[in-house]
Amino acid sequence: MLLIPAIDLKDGHCVRLKQGEMDDATVFSEDPAAMARHWIEQGARRLHLVDLNGAFAGKPKNGAAIRSIVDEVGDDIPVQLGGGVRDLDTIEHYLDNGISYIIIGTAAVKNPGFLHDACGAFPGHIIVGLDARDGKVAVDGWSKMTGHDVVDLAKKYEDYGVEAVIYTDIGRDGMLSGVNVEATVRLAQALRIPVIASGGIASIADIDALCAVEAEGIMGAITGRAIYEGALDFAVAQARADELNGGEG
């Protein structure tokens, strides 16, 4: 199982938000490229970037920081990016400039046709990000709840040809309260494509719990606050996941 470090970008810095609130941000590094290199040195095999300003503005906003990370990472490991992706030109630009996977979140819910077109134009490169509370999907940086059931939407997007689904449990993200394994497994069991867990990972116990159900279709887990604040040692956690699951995966 892949443990994927999150690098959340706000105003060119690496930050973490608590419960998705832009004005409740903790700056962890003013050098995102150095942070990317740090996680690679700790054993990361994929990076998760979020353009937070872009997510709220609906268009790319942290171009310089993203470029610096891509330049630093090179061909070492794949990078997935979300936040502010609302059109095919933006996707093409990122893919042409070193990003491996594009995450589409709010735009997928509000404009399913865009997601469908993106999957057709860039097969194998589109990941859908679904943020949910109590099984219902949220959009616009979690500021608006919808009536959409997360499993129903994910199955629809699977038919479009998305590469994977990132499932974030909003109630737990950035709170170090433990990952919602039950909800993640329920989604993974309903799909043929892999699920990447996100939100709430706090300790080695969460890694153990996810590895125990990896066979249900959980390919990885995104971790942020825990590895930045020291609650979770990334290198130890990735080694633990490899040990439990018999190697890289």
Swiss-Prot record:
Q: Which reactions appear under catalytic activity for this entry?
A: 1-(5-phospho-beta-D-ribosyl)-5-[(5-phospho-beta-D-ribosylamino)methylideneamino]imidazole-4-carboxamide = 5-[(5-phospho-1-deoxy-D-ribulos-1-ylimino)methylamino]-1-(5-phospho-beta-D-ribosyl)imidazole-4-carboxamide
A Pfam family it matches: His_biosynth
Would you identify the family this protein belongs to, as annotated? Belongs to the HisA/HisF family.
Q: Name one GO biological process term.
A: L-tryptophan biosynthetic process
GO CC field: cytoplasm
Keyword check for Protein transport, yes or no: no
Q: Which cysteines are joined by disulfide bonds?
A: none
Q: What's in the keyword line of the UniProt record?
A: Amino-acid biosynthesis, Cytoplasm, Histidine biosynthesis, Isomerase
Q: Which residues form the active site?
A: D8, D131
Q: What is the protein name given in its UniProt record?
A: 1-(5-phosphoribosyl)-5-[(5-phosphoribosylamino)methylideneamino] imidazole-4-carboxamide isomerase
Question: Which Enzyme Commission number(s) are listed?
Answer: 5.3.1.16
List GO molecular-function terms, semicolon-separated: 1-(5-phosphoribosyl)-5-[(5-phosphoribosylamino)methylideneamino]imidazole-4-carboxamide isomerase activity
* Principal location class: cytoplasm
Compartmental location: Cytoplasm
Q: Does the keyword Isomerase apply?
A: yes
The biological pathway it contributes to is:
Amino-acid biosynthesis; L-histidine biosynthesis; L-histidine from 5-phospho-alpha-D-ribose 1-diphosphate: step 4/9
